Amino acid sequence: MNKKRIVFVTGTRADFGKLSGLIKILDNSKYEKLIFITGMHMLTQYGLTKLEVQKFADAQHVEFVNQRPDDMLDTILSKTIMGFSDYILEVKPDLVVYHGDRVESLAAALACTTNYVNSVHVEGGELSGTIDEVFRHSITKLSDYHLVCCSDARNRIIQLGENPENIINIGSPELDFHSKDSGVSL
């Protein structure tokens, strides 16, 4: 049986916290898991958090430096589109999963759309009142499937014109992590 190849895109510790639970629940006998590590993960000034992502031993990792400390968002976006587009043309994923409203997710969504690769946007439909909201809604429109955290977000995505059958309310992905015993007693 051929395994389905799924790429997860992560640019920050925060989005990886949301994606890690989804990565863990995938059956290794059915899915080949790949993690595209970029963004703030790669910068020492943000703690070089790529080291945390690399602890996922049952997933393949690729690292892509998409920015220097003083790069503007448009520069980061264009570098990430080019790097991620090259990557998906090489690995030919069946599906790409990204989270939220960051420039790395926008770049992945654009690369998937222009290369006809199916994609999933996690936590679209949220409101922030910042530039990130524009990114989030753009990412939603570029995505094929949507995993949302509440009915309000689902309704916003439907108002954007997306097919209700492609929107699944899964709740907030990191709640599963927080519901487990951390080993720390109070």
Language model regions located:
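Active-site proximal beta-strand in glycosyltransferases
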Residues: 111-125
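Short N-terminal targeting/anchoring amphipathic segment
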Residues: 86-103
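Hydrophobic/aromatic ligand-binding patch that stacks against planar heteroaromatic rings
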Residues: 25, 108-112, 138-139
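Short glycine/serine/threonine-rich phosphate/pyrophosphate-binding segments
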Residues: 15-19, 102-109, 154
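N-terminal subdomain of nucleotide-sugar transferases
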Residues: 1-41
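A conserved, positively charged/aromatic
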Residues: 128-144
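A nucleotide-sugar donor-handling region in carbohydrate enzymes
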Residues: 9, 42-44, 142-186
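Conserved nucleotide-sugar phosphate-binding/catalytic loop shared by glycosyltransferases and other
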Residues: 32-76, 83
